[in-house]
Amino acid sequence: MTTSHMNGHVTEESDSEVKNVDLASPEEHQKHREMAVDCPGDLGTRMMPIRRSAQLERIRQQQEDMRRRREEEGKKQELDLNSSMRLKKLAQIPPKTGIDNPMFDTEEGIVLESPHYAVKILEIEDLFSSLKHIQHTLVDSQSQEDISLLLQLVQNKDFQNAFKIHNAITVHMNKASPPFPLISNAQDLAQEVQTVLKPVHHKEGQELTALLNTPHIQALLLAHDKVAEQEMQLEPITDERVYESIGQYGGETVKIVRIEKARDIPLGATVRNEMDSVIISRIVKGGAAEKSGLLHEGDEVLEINGIEIRGKDVNEVFDLLSDMHGTLTFVLIPSQQIKPPPAKETVIHVKAHFDYDPSDDPYVPCRELGLSFQKGDILHVISQEDPNWWQAYREGDEDNQPLAGLVPGKSFQQQREAMKQTIEEDKEPEKSGKLWCAKKNKKKRKKVLYNANKNDDYDNEEILTYEEMSLYHQPANRKRPIILIGPQNCGQNELRQRLMNKEKDRFASAVPHTTRSRRDQEVAGRDYHFVSRQAFEADIAAGKFIEHGEFEKNLYGTSIDSVRQVINSGKICLLSLRTQSLKTLRNSDLKPYIIFIAPPSQERLRALLAKEGKNPKPEELREIIEKTREMEQNNGHYFDTAIVNSDLDKAYQELLRLINKLDTEPQWVPSTWLR
């Protein structure tokens, strides 16, 4: 596939550092846009023209109105003619009817031509009338002088002759080109249809079989295939023709490259326009160009199969290469850039922490190659040669995606997100107060029980892009702890308790620590680990607690060692934690599997809580939904998966399925866990 670049996204040429983002206008990016040609599926599209100005649109609309009036007058005259007695009698004769074939569907993109849809030609009288109309509309003296000058030009004989030539060329250029055959094996298809219809006993099927067996139809299909083979077969480019054509490029170093390209394999190269030249700007992994190793970035394309390329824009290159296959002969001027031999790149696997849609990104070099993904998707990055735009495949799409797609590089994405945040902060109006002083935020902070060491403010301001991942299969004797996260009243505590009650030999809870005194019938090490306040505070300072807090002047907390004890016993540790504890837990060596329990819709949540005898207010339900969005936005990068709890029994079965899958399938985990 040959595609095109938009070069406005960088201003520096160094590969060793992040390149600056050029926030140019869409029109500027349109000038540098690269075109994707020979793309799989519907990716390749022609570059859209820049919109006309409003004044030109108004003039065009006036011309359309005049043309429409003439058509209406013509139709009126036609109706007058149709009212004659002879035509009325002819109209009473029943028309010939055929058999309606509901299975027939015109090929997408084929337009049935009709004189009614012919290109409208602007006549000199229309132009003169439009100028007269504009002359009456515009009142300033400068415009009147301009219109008078144009009217004199329109009345000039030389201009009118040139205008007629223009119209004649327009009519010729808009003539439909002869259709290109879609296939050259119509006979084989007819035989296949007959095979399919053999067991069919319907009347229509038998009629179709008989029709396909008639000598006339078989002769027609044979003739079709012969003509199609001639049309679809590219004329071989001989060495003599190539050497003869490159003689015109005397004085320039020229190389000849031949690439075999199958019909179902895209070429996999991107091109851009530099003045009159067509330059290869990117080699895409997975295409015929990359596999051949013969095309390189910076090469100028002079000819393809004997057709001169210099002077063509990327749209014309798109049209030229869209149907080419077989042997492609390129005449190139090699790139003058001296690049070190490419090092063998290793594939890295990353988890995306943001959503990306290339159709909304004005800086993507080639929109047709942009790879869309959602937060949480796994991407297999196979090339980071361009630090700004990586080439990657999305997990699960490798077989259906012949070419690697373009995704923003990590540093590039961080840079433009930082720029976006700066712009948004600058736009925020300052809160005004008395005497031009800013008001203080008097909203009280609600106390929560969580580990406050290693302040989470950095997490909130960190720009999340990608996280490198590796596959990990948990050992049979060392199960990963299961962490349930979710807003209140969403069922995570109920799900945890049900697992504990139904499979006591498989699941266990970490024994918490406390500074309060032991009560009657409580067993140390089973109900709590009873420690002194001094020892508890020392463990807090040492970062040994996943989460902790104070209640009635006593400290409570869950330690990393308590979770590790459950893991070492061979059981699965079940925890229900607050989101503030996830950073400490994830930075430990416990390798947690974090499941987000999300609420259903507001109405469904109300019904579920009503079954439990709860009657929440509408604002309480809205608060739960809003809290869910907040948790997903701020902590979603920690979650391994999510369960929507619309039914507690179904949610329990899904939770059990996910836990069981950890024993049978490897899971993606941060690569730092395995180093």
From Swiss-Prot:
Single GO biological process annotation from the record: protein localization to plasma membrane
Region of interest (Interaction with LIN7C), residue spans: 181-243
SUPFAM superfamilies: L27 domain (SSF101288), P-loop containing nucleoside triphosphate hydrolases (SSF52540), PDZ domain-like (SSF50156), SH3-domain (SSF50044)
Positions of the L27 domain: 120-177, 179-235
Location of the PDZ domain: 256-336
Membrane topology according to the record: Peripheral membrane protein
Highest rank taxon of the organism: Eukaryota
GO cellular component: adherens junction; apical junction complex; apical plasma membrane; axon; bicellular tight junction; cytoplasm; endoplasmic reticulum-Golgi intermediate compartment membrane; extracellular exosome
Keywords associated with the record: ATP-binding, Cell junction, Cell membrane, Cell projection, Golgi apparatus, Host-virus interaction, Membrane, Nucleotide-binding, Phosphoprotein, Repeat, SH3 domain, Tight junction
Region described as Disordered: 1-34, 51-78
Compartment(s) where it occurs, according to its Swiss-Prot or TrEMBL record: Golgi apparatus; Cell membrane; Endomembrane system; Cell junction, Tight junction
Region (Required for the correct localization of PALS1 and PATJ at cell-cell contacts and the normal formation of tight junctions and adherens junctions): 1-345
Record GO terms (molecular function): ATP binding; identical protein binding; protein domain specific binding
Location of the Guanylate kinase-like domain: 479-660
Main location, first listed in the record: Golgi
Residue positions, PTM Phosphoserine: 14, 25, 83-84
Repeat among keywords: yes
InterPro entries tied to this protein: GK/Ca_channel_bsu, Guanylate_kin-like_dom, Guanylate_kinase_CS, L27_C, L27_dom, L27_dom_sf, L27_N, MAGUK
Functional description taken from the UniProt entry: Plays a role in tight junction biogenesis and in the establishment of cell polarity in epithelial cells. Also involved in adherens junction biogenesis by ensuring correct localization of the exocyst complex protein EXOC4/SEC8 which allows trafficking of adherens junction structural component CDH1 to the cell surface. Plays a role through its interaction with CDH5 in vascular lumen formation and endothelial membrane polarity. Required during embryonic and postnatal retinal development. (Microbial infection) Acts as an interaction partner for human coronaviruses SARS-CoV and, probably, SARS-CoV-2 envelope protein E which results in delayed formation of tight junctions and disregulation of cell polarity.
Complex formation: Heterodimer with MPP1. Forms a heterotrimeric complex composed of PALS1, LIN7B and PATJ; the N-terminal L27 domain of PALS1 interacts with the L27 domain of PATJ and the C-terminal L27 domain of PALS1 interacts with the L27 domain of LIN7B. Component of a complex composed of PALS1, CRB1 and MPP4. Component of a complex whose core is composed of ARHGAP17, AMOT, PALS1, PATJ and PARD3/PAR3. Component of a complex composed of PALS1, CRB1 and EPB41L5. Within the complex, interacts (via HOOK domain) with EPB41L5 (via FERM domain), and interacts with CRB1 (via intracellular domain).
PANTHER family documented for this protein: MEMBRANE-ASSOCIATED GUANYLATE KINASE MAGUK
Domain comment, as recorded: The L27 domain 1 functions in targeting to the tight junctions by binding to and stabilizing PATJ. The PDZ domain binds to the C-terminus of SC6A1.
Family stated for the protein in its record: Belongs to the MAGUK family.
Protein name: Protein PALS1
Organism, scientific name: Homo sapiens (Human)
Lineage, broadest ranks: Eukaryota, Metazoa, Chordata, Craniata, Vertebrata
